[in-house]
Curated annotation (Swiss-Prot):
Residues 1-14 form the Peptidase S1 domain. Its EC number is 3.4.21.-. GO terms for biological process: proteolysis. Its main location: secreted. Keywords: Hydrolase, Protease, Secreted, Serine protease. This is Cocoonase. GO terms for molecular function: serine-type peptidase activity.
């Protein structure tokens, strides 16, 4: 993921 949150799994693909 680029420029987002990664909590265990990619969340909010910002």
């Amino acid at each position: 993921i680029v420029g987002g949150f990664t909590i265990g799994i990619d969340t909010v693909p910002y």
